[in-house]
């Protein structure tokens, strides 16, 4: 999919750059694979805002995606590639030989009519899912599991991928987009190829309203508030906040590390925070 530029017929069109979706299916999703979605507006069951900057947006239906790919040794045919409002990647409707339909994340270079299969060991071509331990070293893959049978958790957004860089002690070593290198169990599943829609990051929405259609509300900067409302608030004239960036509740933000799972630290070979080699 390429990028689409628009003529500046209005201020909102000037600079507007969107992904060209002309090659996607234009009909409705499969009803049996969708569910209604109720908007929360960022509120919890008590009506309190628990996640700021959420509200409004176009009505959406949730599409059930097969992240597990545990339907082994049954070949499927890609019926169509669709847009999914719930994620940045495109999705593919697969019809298996036994008649079952399923949505999967569409990888790059997957086209309508292509055959895909999930097996313990399969051909290394986009859309095929297999155990990480059976993939050749150097393979680019996505939708990678962290626990066998749990379903893919790593590399699911547009353009994301993981590269298998080695094997050791019955496990595989993968390199993530962030630069982190870590061990994963060899019996975890992964799907060959990088996720579709890599140009998603190059879009320019052109106007605030287009972001509002996505259900994202504007966020007021802390330095623009009063001291009663934010730790960065107040001061005479424009100020920088006077301290390291914090949330309205005084917790460090913008780069503060929040990882707490020490049990799995031993599986991380190279941290994503390690200095990049020149």
Swiss-Prot record:
This is Large ribosomal subunit protein uL2. It comes from Erythrobacter litoralis (strain HTCC2594). The keyword ATP-binding does not apply. It comes from the Bacteria. Belongs to the universal ribosomal protein uL2 family. Pfam families: Ribosomal_L2, Ribosomal_L2_C. GO terms for cellular component: large ribosomal subunit. Keywords: Ribonucleoprotein, Ribosomal protein, RNA-binding, rRNA-binding. GO terms for biological process: cytoplasmic translation. Residues 269-278 have a biased composition (Basic residues). NCBIfam families: rplB_bact. InterPro entries: NA-bd_OB-fold, Rib_uL2_dom2, Ribosomal_uL2, Ribosomal_uL2_bac/org-type, Ribosomal_uL2_C, Ribosomal_uL2_CS, Ribosomal_uL2_dom3, Ribosomal_uL2_RNA-bd_dom. Residues 29-53, 221-278 are annotated as: Disordered. One of the primary rRNA binding proteins. Required for association of the 30S and 50S subunits to form the 70S ribosome, for tRNA binding and peptide bond formation. It has been suggested to have peptidyltransferase activity; this is somewhat controversial. Makes several contacts with the 16S rRNA in the 70S ribosome. Part of the 50S ribosomal subunit. Forms a bridge to the 30S subunit in the 70S ribosome. One of its GO terms (molecular function) is rRNA binding. Signal peptide: none annotated.
């Amino acid at each position: 999919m390429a990028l689409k530029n628009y003529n500046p017929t209005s201020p909102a069109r000037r600079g507007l750059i969107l992904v060209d979706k002309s090659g996607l299916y234009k009909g409705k999703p499969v009803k049996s694979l969708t569910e209604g979605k109720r908007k929360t507006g960022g509120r919890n069951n008590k009506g309190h805002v628990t996640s700021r900057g959420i509200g409004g947006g176009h009505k959406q239906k949730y599409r059930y995606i097969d992240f597990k790919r545990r339907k082994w040794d049954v070949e499927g045919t890609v019926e169509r590639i669709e847009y999914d409002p719930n994620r940045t990647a495109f999705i593919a409707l697969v019809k298996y030989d036994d008649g079952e339909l399923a949505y999967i994340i569409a990888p790059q270079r997957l086209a309508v009519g292509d055959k895909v299969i999930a097996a313990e060991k399969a051909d290394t071509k986009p859309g095929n899912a297999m155990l990480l331990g059976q993939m050749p070293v150097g393979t680019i893959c996505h939708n990678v599991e962290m626990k066998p049978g749990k379903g893919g958790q790593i590399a699911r957004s547009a353009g994301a991928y993981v590269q298998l860089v080695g094997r050791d002690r019955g496990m595989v070593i993968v390199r993530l987009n962030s630069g982190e290198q870590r061990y994963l169990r060899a019996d975890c599943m992964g799907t060959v190829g990088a996720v579709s829609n890599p140009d998603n990051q190059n879009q320019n929405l052109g106007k605030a309203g287009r972001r509002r259609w996505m259900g994202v509300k504007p966020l007021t900067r802390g330095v623009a508030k009063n001291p009663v409302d934010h730790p960065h608030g107040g001061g005479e004239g424009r100020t920088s906040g006077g301290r390291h960036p914090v949330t309205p509740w005084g917790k460090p933000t913008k780069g503060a590390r929040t990882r707490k799972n020490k049990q799995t630290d031993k599986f991380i070979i190279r941290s994503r925070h390690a200095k990049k080699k020149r």
